[in-house]
Amino acid sequence: SSAASDVYKRQKFLGSEAGVFPYVRGTRAHNRWKIHQTVIVNCPKEANAVALKILNAGVDSIEFQIVPETFSAEDLNTLLKDIHIPAVEITFSGSKTAHVAELVIAKIEKEQLPAEEVHINFCIDPLVKKLTSKGSFCSENGAKCFEKIADLVRKTKTYKGIRVITVSGEIFSNAGSTIVEALAFSLAAGHDYLVRLMDMGFTIEEAAKKIRFSQAITSNYFMEIAKLRAGRMLWANIVKAYNPAKNCPCKMFTHAVTSTWNQTAYDPYVNMLRGTTEAMSASIAGVHSLEVTPFNKAYEDPNEFSMRIARNVELLLKHESHFDQVVDPAGGSYYIENLTDSIANEAWKLFREIEEKGGYTAAYESGFIVERVKASAAAKDKNIATRREILLGANQYPNFTEVAGKELTEAAVTRPVSEGNTLAPYRGSMAFEAMRLHVDRSGKAPKAFMLTCGSLAMARARAQFSCNFFACAGIKVIDNTFFKSIEEGVKAALESKAEIVVVCASDDDYAEAAPKVKELLGDKAILVVAGAPACMPELEAQGIKNFINVKSNVLETLKFYLKEMGI
């Protein structure tokens, strides 16, 4: 890895420019990325109508995600009716993509479209989409898949604008990987494809130019800018090692899509804000195309409104903020250059580790890749349960008055099981949402009452903390400015019929206040003390057992109280 670092440091400041190897600053001398949106194809005719509409609304890169298992040449003609192929980039994903690719190639050959005017991508990805997600190739050891890929690469040799393979890097991110893992594993899968294609007789140039990378962008703003910059540099060096005649094949062709891992199903409009900062990261770093995930994707099929907002984020970044007018504005920023360097180093280390195991396929088969991602996901889950990591609207600052609508189903908040050596996408907020949905649908309306007393400033601070704490489970919080006496507070608490009463005061007040509340309250409600006062052992000795504070595992603690209330 020190070699990679030296390479990077040498290349970093030597008047590095966009469009010049190793492409840290971009593969082109401009930053005109394409605005990408996905249309789900159940019925080709309906999908065509949606496509024409969004193409008129500023989209210049369209993805057709094909759902039906059978798809004919006639279906393809219906789907592409009135779409001028040279005017737009088209991507095909979903079921039977290799079969669809055959149909597409036949169509463009029949229509004799000039090769340089065709810009088409296929999301064929047996290594990540099949092997890593499903646990196996479509056929024994994948021989069939790779023969098919080789056939498509041969057929599209003259079409520089057709990319056959898309490395689905978002699968790692959306299963909970770290930024470094997502990059290293994507590079390793890309390298595996290169090696396989060269083994099948293709040159490095022919192989590299058929590979497209797709990456998820999370809300970790600066790290994501650095990831995309580091990725270009590392991929350029990987391809360069095979001595291509020119540098052009060393350019990483990258599509970015905003993350689904951090999307929340409660308070979903916050997802619009996440998508915005993520789109900014991608457009500052420079990508070929960018898709902002519609804000409601977590719980329903995107609709006209959510798709329009998603497009408008990018249209605004271009037409109002002019992000497309500047290339790599982050270049030369000490902070971002250093981050790029450290991500490049860490990702290169991990890439080398995979190569030492025999490449991506071997590393996957040994369990290394999936175990790595699952360990990262488990660490993130713990961070979210304990609020080391924040997901707005889920584990912090929830919308107090929100009740789940009928569009929010149990399926939307249930984490998919990833059997054995496979990765399944999930969302970081699912555990909180499943708990809250259970409360929303329980037919009960549990309440938590804030008994604020003692010193006013501390009482308010503790009440604010406690309200946010209990509201995360959909428990109705009753906040109170301040009670002059504990008797007055307990009387109001009993009148509210709240199942939980939270004493909110300063640490010094608790030794006296908490036992008094307990005495007056009896067993008519669950008593909770907000904080971790020094007198905790004495209070526990008096039977006061419940404390919430910044060290609490919010998720487990809330589940405990729900159980106590019989919900």
Task: Locate predicted features.
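N-terminal small/glycine-rich loop or linker at the start of catalytic domains
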Residues: 17-42, 126-135, 166-176, 255-260, ...
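Long, structured ligand/cofactor-binding scaffold of large enzymes
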Residues: 9-113
